[in-house]
Structures are given as C-alpha cells and as structure tokens.
Curated annotation (Swiss-Prot):
Optimum pH is 7.5. The lineage of its organism: Bacteria, Pseudomonadati, Pseudomonadota, Betaproteobacteria, Burkholderiales. Its main location: cytoplasm. Inhibited by cobalt, copper and EDTA. Its cofactor is Zn(2+). Belongs to the metallo-dependent hydrolases superfamily. N-acyl-D-amino-acid deacylase family. GO terms for molecular function: N-acyl-D-glutamate deacylase activity. One of its GO terms (cellular component) is cytoplasm. Its EC number is 3.5.1.82. It is found in: Cytoplasm. This is N-acyl-D-glutamate deacylase. The gene is dag.
C-alpha cells in the first residue's frame, strides 16, 4: 500500500531549478522532504493544493542578506517570504552577528545590523537561532570586521602575529560551529586597512575546511578593476572559493567597466579559481551614509538618521538646501545614518546579471526606517522585469540563478532543486503577474504574484504558522560546493 503524503501540490508547471524546461507535474511532500514528482492524482494525501497552472519552483536562495539579528528580533521575515525566499546567507560585507567586539572597539558598518548586542561567538549565535527557530533557512558567514574588532586592541592598525593567529583561530572556531565561510568588507573600516598577508591567512583557514570567502570589494568606482583583481588573487593564491558581492561599477565614468571585470572573472575561472558573483536588480546601492561621498554623487536619499530621524526618505540635496549648507556638511550632521546612492547604470546591472555564475542577493537592510526597495522586491523584480518584460533570460534559467546555482556555490545540500529526497522548499507563483511592487517612495510593499511558499514542507506564506517556525541552520557541504565547472 502506498504511504500517504502530507501534501500534494497538483496542477502546476514544475521548474526543477536545474535549468531544464518546465513540465506539467504534481509535487508530493512527506514531512520536510519531497517524496514524489509526477502524476499524483491517485496518490493518497492528507491535503491537496491546486496550483492552477502556476509555476512550482524551488524556494529562492538570497545569497546576500543582512538579517543576522532579525531572526531573533523579528522572526516573521515577511520581506523574505513574500517574494519567495526560503533560505538566506547572512554575515555579509565583513559584518555578522558574532563575534562581539572587544570593549571599546566599534565600526560604523555594524549599524547595518541594528542596535541589538552581538553574540560572543558564532556558537552562541547559532544557539540563539536554534532556540528561536527562524521562519526560513539560514546559512551564516563570519565577518572579517568582527574578527578584527574581537582580536585586535587597535583594529585600525595592522595585526601583530599574535592577533593574526587569534583571528585565524576565531575563524576556525566559527567554521567548526557551522559558518559556511567568512566575508570581507574592504570598502569599510576596519576591513579596509587589511593587507594581502592578513587576507591570505584567513582564506587559507577557510580553504582548508572547505569554506568560502565572499567580498564587498575595496572599490566599486574608479578602481573597480583593481579591486576585483585583488579578491580574485586571494582565491588564486589560497585555493579558497570566492564570491564577489553585489558586483557593480559606480559613477558614470566607470559605466561599462563590467565588460573588463567579467572578462577578468572568466580568466580567473579558466585558470582554476572557483569564483561566482551576485547582484541585486536595481541601479541604486544602499549602505551607511559616508560624508566623503556626499559631493561625489548627485542623487543620494537618506534611509535613516539617528540624530535626525525625520529626514528618512528625503533627498540629501533637499536637506542641505533646507539647512543652508553643502552636502558634505549636511551628511556629517545626519550621521550616523544610512543612504541610497543612485550611481549605477541599469544596462550594466543587466549585463552583469546575465553572467553564467551570477546569482541574486537582495542586500536588503531590514533595520532601515525607509529601506531600499530591494529588501522586499529583488527576486520578484528579476522574474517580472528582467524575465517577463525584458526577456534577458528564460524563466527556467532565471530560476536556476536563484536556486540551484547558489545551492551549489554555497554547498547547501539538497536545496535549490525540486527532486525526490530534496528538502521541500517550494514557491508557487504566477509567471504572468509576478513582479516587485516596492518602490523608492513606498519601499515596503509586498510583491505581486507569489501565491504559496513552503519551507521544509511547512507553509510560511501567504499565512505564517502561528506557533511553528520551520527554518533550519544550513551548513556547507564541501563535497557538492562550487561554481558550476568546479562542482564535483
């Protein structure tokens, strides 16, 4: 007698995440895993969900999140589930929920994570996640800035041999606790003062344990080519798998340089460097407000300000005019603060997106009072604007970029694909209507066209379970990890 299924999603078009053509099939789920795919019209099941001709796909994997502390503070994560995200990689740009800095040490970039205290080490961070249970799955990186702040008395200096060993030991402990790798934020301090020996030392620790290095590179403007090459060289010297975070070329003088940076990435891959990259599908970036940039970019919008919260959502130029000062002075008065910088070319973003090893990472900042719309709309924007409207890729190829590709790059076993035995992370969406609705002026509007989202077999959208959060902590399986030609 056939064992009963818990749920059958029937009447949909299945896209398995691996890039192949969609097919008409039912998906059967038992417990937390997919138990059957095919014609399940006669299969016994406790529940049936009529997909009504919609797309049934693997849940999306957000490769670049800053939700590190949100799993404890606001575990509902509606900004993720409402756009079909079932897993996220946190700890990016060199900052993470652990380890906590030594007393007296701090860094401006930590404000991106919010005001909650950090955890002493990654083991304690993961313990808190296990106790709280996230709504979606979480893979975590440990931040290089955190390592510096926790190991060095003067994080603005070069590490002593003892401090370098301490950072490497902390990294090894974090990887042992479950981190999938480490991240650098070389455009921020204190990571920006790190030199080759320091980065190579950490990358060797990661490589020896099958982990990876993701990097917010040192410069995304005039020196973007050199900054890309710097990180590729770390991977080449150490054998550490590498991800270039939110790759972009900022400022009009640098638009078009992605042709060179992508060519350099391809040459590195051909030479044996395991490298991938990600983008968010918008022509504006967002991070902390940096006064030194205020007179370099014409269009800057404030997302939050501690001394002037009333300025959230307003243009820096308008604020400066109202205050009767220049933009740099206004920015200094607003800090600590966050901002959106409109300095990217949409056509270039689209070119980068089409690279075969490019994934999608929202880079969303959930603590911002007036966030960048990428927080709520990145994945549905790809489906609606890049696929349906612009026809940059087939729907199947775009889904692969958001599912199987990141699962391979980050070594997330049995994720990112619809197959018997895989974890039941599933999104059901209408290919004809799916799109982002979040805008620069209304950045927290939920997406259109996402109809059902399941995490490990449990429905989390449109209605989250009242008392159960089904997410898991994801560890890296080095045996399946790597950008496509490096996967085993």
């Amino acid at each position: 007698m056939q064992e009963k299924l818990d749920l059958v999603i029937e009447g949909g078009w299945v896209i398995d995440g691996l890039g192949g053509p969609r097919r008409r099939a039912d998906v059967g789920i038992r417990g937390e895993r997919i138990a059957a795919i095919g014609d399940l019209s006669a299969a016994p099941a406790d529940r049936r969900l009529d997909a009504g001709g919609r797309i049934v796909a693997p849940g999306f994997i957000d490769t670049h999140g800053h939700d590190d502390l949100m799993f404890v503070e606001k575990p509902g994560l509606e900004w993720k589930t409402s756009q079909g995200i079932t897993s996220v990689v946190v700890g990016n740009c060199g900052i993470s929920g652990a380890p906590a800095p030594l007393p007296g040490n701090t860094a401006a970039a930590l404000a991106l994570l919010g005001d909650s205290p950090l955890f002493a080490d990654m083991a304690m961070y993961f313990g808190a996640l296990e106790a709280q249970r996230p709504m979606i799955n979480v893979a975590a990186l440990v931040g290089h800035a955190n390592l510096r702040l926790a190991a060095m008395r003067d994080p603005a200096a070069q590490p002593s041999a003892k401090e370098q060993r301490a950072m490497e030991r902390m990294l090894a402990d974090a990887l042992e606790a479950g981190a999938v790798g480490f991240s650098t934020g070389l455009a921020y301090q204190p990571g920006g003062v790190a030199e080759q020996a320091e980065l190579d030392g950490l990358a060797r620790v990661a490589a020896a344990r099958g982990a990876l290095h993701t990097s917010h590179i040192r410069n995304e403007g005039d020196a973007v080519e050199a900054a890309v090459d710097e990180v590729l060289a770390v991977g080449r010297r150490t054998g550490c798998a590498t991800v270039l975070s939110h790759h972009k070329c900022m400022m009009p003088a640098n638009w078009g340089k992605s042709a060179a940076t992508l060519a350099n990435i391809d040459r590195a891959r051909a030479a044996g460097v395991d490298v991938a990259l990600d983008i968010y599908p918008y022509p504006g970036s967002s991070t902390i407000l940096i006064p030194e940039r205020a007179d370099q970019i014409d269009d800057i919008r404030i997302t939050w300000s501690t001394p002037h919260p009333e300025c959230g959502g307003q243009s820096l130029a308008e604020i400066a005019a109202r205050w009767g000062c220049d933009a740099v002075t206004a920015a200094r008065r607003l800090c600590p603060a966050g901002a959106i910088y409109f300095a990217m070319d949409e056509n270039e973003v689209r070119r980068i997106f089409q690279h075969e090893c490019c994934m999608v990472g929202s880079d969303g900042l959930p603590n911002d009072a007036h966030p960048h719309p990428r927080l709520w709309g990145s994945f549905t924007r790809v489906l609606g604007r890049y696929v349906r409207e612009a026809e940059l890729l087939t729907l199947e190829a775009a889904v692969a970029k958001m599912t199987a590709l990141p699962a391979r790059v980050f070594g997330l076993a049995d994720r990112g694909r619809l197959a018997v035995g895989a974890w039941a992370d599933v999104v059901v969406f209408d290919a004809d209507t799916v799109c982002d609705r979040a805008t620069w002026d209304a950045p927290t509007l939920a997406s259109a066209g996402i109809e059902h989202v399941l995490v490990n077999g449990c429905a989390v959208f449109p209605q989250a379970p009242p008392s159960h959060r089904p997410g898991r902590i994801l560890r890296r399986d080095a045996s399946i990890a790597g950008a496509p030609e490096f996967s085993r």
